[in-house]
Amino acid sequence: MSPSAIAEKKQVDNIQEIKDKNQEPAHHEYEHLTNVGVVKQKPIDHRLKDNIKTHYSPHLDGLQEYKRQYQESIENPEKFFSEKARSFMNWFRDFDRVFVPDVDNPTKPSFENNAWFLNGQLNTCYNCVDRHALKTPNKTAIIYEADEPGEGYSMSYKELLEKVCQVAQILKYSMNVKKGDTVAVYMPMIPEALITLLAISRIGAIHSVVFAGFSSNSLRDRINDAGSRVVITADESNRGGKIIETKRIVDDALRETPQVEHVLVYRRTNNPQVNFQAPRDLDWETERKKYKTYFPCEPVDSEHPLFLLYTSGSTGTPKGVQHSTAGYLLGALLTMRYTFDVHQEDVFFTAGDIGWITGHTYCVYGPLLYGCTTLVFEGTPAYPNFSRYWEIIDKHQVTQFYVAPTALRLLKRAGDSFIDGFSLKSLRCLGSVGEPIAAEVWEWYSDKIGKNEIPIVDTYWQTESGSHLVTPLAGGVTPMKPGSASLPFFGIETVILDPTTGEEINDSHAEGVLAIKRPWPSFARTIWKNHDRFLDTYLNPYKGYYFTGDGAARDKDGYIWILGRVDDVVNVSGHRLSTAEIEAAIIEDRMVAECAVVGFNDDLTGQAVAAFVVLKDKSTWASASEEELQDIKKHLILTVRKDIGPFAAPKLIVLVDDLPKTRSGKIMRRILRKILAGESDQLGDVSTLSNPGVVKHLIDSVKL
């Protein structure tokens, strides 16, 4: 069976396995985790900077105001979201309907025909750049911190507008990009990456950013799926003191992308040895100087696609999640305002890459929509030392800092001496993103970075949601519980479903599958060129609900606790990786007969990847030396690094004689997860396996 066929079979099995493993009677396995004290937010007046001190007030007047507005967003979404959209966004043509109503409940938006702000017209770039450049042209839009300390610079809204307009003309006239075309972007975290996205949206094209850590094979697949004729990249990247051959990776990918006509190359390092293939490749600066510094926006409909972002799916084939323009922008803007209590005088630092949704929403679009300053950081938290984040925060007087728990665990492990000497008093809000944050990391973050004075917003959301689903709200609004994402954002109606029956659990303490009962403006509209897959992945598993793929608990106060993925996706360092995609890469190796990939807990990255591998010729390892075994494992790890990227490489390879399977041939990955978690005594009844004797062999193999 081919890797793609194996992946498709996994999709069919996936939901059933979720239900199979929940056949036992309901119990409160995680209730003890939710028994934590409430941490109330404290006044932050003494942290206000001079440019905001005289007129600052929170956007919401406490928890009761949140509850009132939340109730309105659920009971009267038409009024709530129309007022917000008209108040905070500029429209070239006003919308005449807020959403397509549900057939059975006209006051509720429809999942099947999810569309918002119908017949309205606007432009993303105008809302992010033009309107601020007109009002406050000299205000700083972007602060750039290069990989090497001291090499950065700032850019005003006026300068940003001029550069965006020039790149928009490169796209339109030098590269023949038209409204509705997709443009692939493979760039490091530099201002030119933001300029690129804004220029693409300015002419009504659709950007498809590929994280610059993906391999050439992964990049190739995403370019081909999106049908991009144009790729924008850099010659090289700087990260952690190392040079990354960005353009070489693009060149390798383009060997199998016949439709690509042009590549625009920004010379980040100006290395003359980097391949430049004329006339296909165009030089950023040479082209930019050809064009004037103003070029008008292209009005687009509210539902016009803004971008595709490929995310890992349970079948292994990456999904091009498609976001629309108006709904996505409103979600980004409202969460900036209410989650982080952002004001236009603020400096917002998201330590996330634009290759992921966090960088899209909270480095590019959210801050610029709101008219504040966004900080773009090219480097890593450990270079040149573990003080880098804190140095940046003090240097630029950052007011909101947003980072993944993986980075916090790394910095906590490095020791508090790296924090000594830094004030960090400009901060008013700390954020966590990408994975659940453990209570002890939350407390360290609050104590050492926030001085126990400022809120931590532990945000839960996804590529598909576009913006926050469940989160505390800063500005003195939400009492916090360390480890909990807390309460749903406006318009988000969360429910806990019984995984077996699909029925809502309304107990005071509920555990099950987290689902959303109604669509919201920033919810993804489809999967690019595959709406059936969108329905099968998100809306069909539990009819009438959006299936998040996460398990969750809801405590007696209504707070949501995320318990992790219930599908075949592993969350490594806040990045969702498809186990099926990793399996497919390993199975393609000529030595391998079968493979099963699962996630397991890791102190640093949250989860790590483990691969259980059956070789075609078992004799090749049954009598092999330890050195030969290590060579086999290294070879398989390198296979994944090359096919997908370094971040997807398994931390553990276990060579085994066989895998645990049902009589129908389905691999029971649940058993592998239990063994890795040290829960071999909790496997349940394994007599239904076609090969029950393999369980002891697996346990012994992991011990080895």
Swiss-Prot record:
The family this protein is said to belong to: Belongs to the ATP-dependent AMP-binding enzyme family.
The reaction(s) this protein catalyses: acetate + ATP + CoA = acetyl-CoA + AMP + diphosphate
Claim: Ligase is one of the keywords in the record: yes
Origin superkingdom: Eukaryota
Chain sites annotated for binding ATP: 434-436, 458-463, 550, 565, 576
Motif stretch (Microbody targeting signal): 702-704
GO-annotated molecular function: acetate-CoA ligase activity; acid-ammonia (or amide) ligase activity; AMP binding; ATP binding
Places the protein is found: Microsome; Endoplasmic reticulum
GO biological-process terms attached to the record: acetate fermentation; acetyl-CoA biosynthetic process from acetate
Signal peptide: none
InterPro entries reported for this sequence: Ac_CoA_lig, ACAS_N, AMP-bd_C, AMP-bd_C_sf, AMP-binding_CS, AMP-dep_synth/lig_dom, ANL_N_sf
EC numbers for this chain: 6.2.1.1
Record GO cellular component, one term: cytosol
Protein keywords: ATP-binding, Endoplasmic reticulum, Ligase, Microsome, Nucleotide-binding
Regions that span the bilayer: none
Keyword Nucleotide-binding appears in the UniProt entry: yes
Subcellular location, principal: other
NCBIfam families, sorted: Ac_CoA_lig_AcsA, PRK00174.1
Primary gene name: ACS1
Listed name of the protein: Acetyl-coenzyme A synthetase 1
A Pfam family the protein falls into: AMP-binding
Binding, CoA: 239-242, 358, 573, 641
Catalytic EC class: ligase
